[in-house]
Amino acid sequence: MKHEHPDRLMNRTPLSLAALETHDAFAERHIGPDAASQQAMLDTLGFASRAALIDAVIPASIRRAEALPLGPFAQPKSEAEALAALRALADKNQVFRSYIGQGYYDSHTPAVILRNVLENPAWYTAYTPYQPEISQGRLEALLNFQQMVVDLTGLAISNASLLDEATAAAEAMTLLQRTGKPKSNVFYVADDVLPQTLEVVRTRALPIGIEVKTGPAAEAAQAGAFGVLLQYPGVNGDVRDYRALTDAIHAAGGHVVVAADLLALTVLTPPGEWGADVAVGNTQRFGVPMGFGGPHAAYMAVRDEFKRQMPGRLVGVTVDAQGKPALRLALQTREQHIRREKATSNVCTAQALLAIMASMYAVYHGPHGLKTIALRVNRIAALLAAGVKQLGFTTVNDTFFDTLTIDAGARTAQLHAFANAKRINLRRVSDTQVGVSVDETTTRDDLADLLAVFAQAAGGTAPDVDALDAGLPGVAALPAGLERTSAYLTHHVFNRHHSETEMLRYLRSLSDKDLALDRSMIPLGSCTMKLNATSEMLPVTWPEFGRIHPFAPSEQTAGYREMIDQLEQMLVAATGYAAVSLQPNAGSQGEYAGLLVIHAYHASRGEAHRDVCLIPASAHGTNPASAHMAGMKVVVVACDAQGNVDIADLKAKAEQHANDLAAIMITYPSTHGVFEQNVREICEIVHAHGGQVYVDGANMNAMVGLTAPGQFGGDVSHLNLHKTFCIPHGGGGPGVGPVAVGPHLAKFLPNQRSTGYARGEEGIGAVSAAPYGSASILPISWMYIAMMGAKNLTAATETAILNANYIAKRLAPHYPVLYSGPGGLVAHECILDLRPIKETSGITVDDVAKRLMDYGFHAPTMSFPVPGTLMVEPTESESQEELDRFIAAMIAIREEIRAVEEGRADREDNPLRHAPHTAAVVTANEWPHAYSREQAAYPVASLVTNKYWPPVGRADNAYGDRNLFCSCVPMSEYA
């Protein structure tokens, strides 16, 4: 309920406290149009109320009969109340000094990066840089990431982030299987690889028929494997010389993947220099908090011959229309949004924001700073090794970078108890061994405390740190011949911005190049670019969430687990399902997990042969890519002229494949932006033929509070918390893709047995490296739901539908709306058909998208799900004023097109064909165009006082792919 204006309240006496409460205040901040604006839009649509509109849009047969059953969160909390409640949960976590290692380390996030990247909406509210001209800042930051990875690994080319180290290793496995055309189906994993990585690799291998073998690294060449995974350094700390082994593996016809620690590579010979084919790993220790497991940016680097088979996004250099350097996403034909089931991966949302943070950590410290950090870490480990040896303990590994495995024998349990008393976590290697992994946050005092713990267990006196330091030689415990001699990070960007002043200005210069939600609406269909409220974002940087190791003892993570349990129940309420897993760390991974759950269900019933997945022709590209990864055969179901699933074709395909039908994957509302009237019938047809129904949750923003997939026939869905539930897109990640299931599938949800996290014996294997995936950003969605409450979450959904229908109604006279439901209404998005315009004027959807940049807007989704169209999704967060500004821009562009159609403007020399227009072009001495500079730069009057200038002209995509270059550009190129 909208609280009343204070002037009206002041006229009443007496005032009550209840009348002055503002529990709904956040909803008014989140939902853009106020009551008057909503009524004006409803009047335009011909409806008396929002409820009447919703009744006309959503089929009555699937409407929720009850309010969202949010229990204690049904009533909204104010921002202050929600923050206080979450703070109480955070305070239940215990922040110990964690030396567990196993791929996760405490780190210092430089304050200038914390404030100006992680906490800066110019960075975290941006979308994936598919429109390169308005994404040059984050593209440069991601190119820096690629250069950093290439330099440190010694390989030829790197992508712009993957989800985590474990899934990166799994992607490397499938890359080698694709490219090598191997006779073998064996992938060999050395026994000192991180245990969580091994588990994810096994999960990925099983449905596609790869046999995973494990054993000593030394035996890898005899395994007959098409690929071998090595850890460098190993999980127990060993640093091994793998040169001879790599040669032997190659001689046997195999390839080598190395999971490498980037900080260690500043002092160790990089894998590319000793023959590795692929390197993968995590960049978390480059200034990104542990966050109970994520999010963190993984990396992959490969030899040149594998570049066109790499998964994920790749930033490349091209030229713009003026011949100046410009950045863009390269080789996109590898990706799921184009190649679908033939894609190199199902990755869509990755970890762009975290990759940017890691790259800026390298920029800020530079090569000398990184090496100093690495040498200091190694020195502390060496001093610890010397100290524990003095106390009578034996170190299992004689070579190390930052990790020691120590044989404590019968004193092991006592050692853990003494450490616990000092709020220290050690790794529990076995009943007789402990592991200690130090990091850049480990201080001299921390080292003294560690030595004191070992001394207490030994019944002796802790050695003096200074005395140990004085008696220890220079660089310790690195194998002879493995100390790095090659230069790295030589590009000027890593050697210039080392003062905070320079770094601050560099970050500002990059963010100024980009168009994010802090400047204007981003009406991308199927992407739900809604408000990421500041109060939702604040807890992400709390140390009680950030400094928790994912494998910390459960008694230290009580607050996290309570918050996660509450969020899971919130999502159960929203979806109508029975159980939720938050482990998948992207929507694509949630899809994949859901399909594995379906397979496990069929297998439990003796029907493991069911492997056909029906997918409508309009589906998002991740659907067929995920189905292929899950070992399923994709059978496409046609759509009818209205964009709905063709029921006759569905019946025929379901009947044809009745014996082996596993599932159907549908999106609801459909990818055409319509609530299909026959969704229950679709579900019934599939169930009748033995299949399960997967409802893609990408469009959940049109359903929350109004309908629920678990109630109209769905068996499993993934959600996108970075869409519906307010986690920001971060320029291409992070995301969270929970998988929600019906009661019959709950016992099959993902486990992580390697770390002791198990939901049940029948659960599928881990799909992410950490038990709860990207846990540290889950508070964002918790805050959103807590501050909205049941009623306002429903109101948000209704407003999203209202805004979309308002845009469709206003633009219909200018651009045909391709699909609609009864009464000409759409769901939360609409598709504008630009194909007739191309026929009459030669103007393409790409031209319109680029011209929108001159008007200060990011284009809607281009050519999905129908080529030659724009899909518009305004979300509930945009005000009527902003909607009207976008509508005015689209109408003005239509008039520019009409000028071409009528011959008043040239078919080639017009503002659309040459868009976007940079400041340099508009202010140049020569102006070669028939249209004016003013029309180019200021096509509407409002831009005169608030103008965003695209930093580059139109990027030449074909040139960039023909001349692939994915490293930092020399400064001379910008002259």
From Swiss-Prot:
Reaction catalysis annotation: N(6)-[(R)-lipoyl]-L-lysyl-[glycine-cleavage complex H protein] + glycine + H(+) = N(6)-[(R)-S(8)-aminomethyldihydrolipoyl]-L-lysyl-[glycine-cleavage complex H protein] + CO2
Cofactors required: pyridoxal 5'-phosphate
Which cellular component, as a GO term, is one annotated location? cytosol
Gene Ontology biological process: glycine decarboxylation via glycine cleavage system
Record's keyword annotation contains Nucleotidyltransferase:
no
One molecular function GO term is: glycine binding
What Gene3D superfamilies does the entry give? Aspartate Aminotransferase, domain 1, Type I PLP-dependent aspartate aminotransferase-like (Major domain)
User: Which InterPro entries does the record associate with it?
Assistant: GcvP, GDC-P_C, GDC-P_N, GDC_P, PyrdxlP-dep_Trfase, PyrdxlP-dep_Trfase_major, PyrdxlP-dep_Trfase_small
- Might you give the EC number(s) for this enzyme? 1.4.4.2
Reply yes or no: does the keyword Secreted apply: no
Residue(s) carrying N6-(pyridoxal phosphate)lysine: 723
Q: Which UniProt keywords apply?
A: Oxidoreductase, Pyridoxal phosphate
Lineage top rank: taxon: Bacteria
The protein's job, in short, is: The glycine cleavage system catalyzes the degradation of glycine. The P protein binds the alpha-amino group of glycine through its pyridoxal phosphate cofactor; CO(2) is released and the remaining methylamine moiety is then transferred to the lipoamide cofactor of the H protein.
Q: How does it assemble?
A: The glycine cleavage system is composed of four proteins: P, T, L and H.
Q: Which family does it belong to?
A: Belongs to the GcvP family.
Name by which UniProt lists this protein:
Glycine dehydrogenase (decarboxylating)
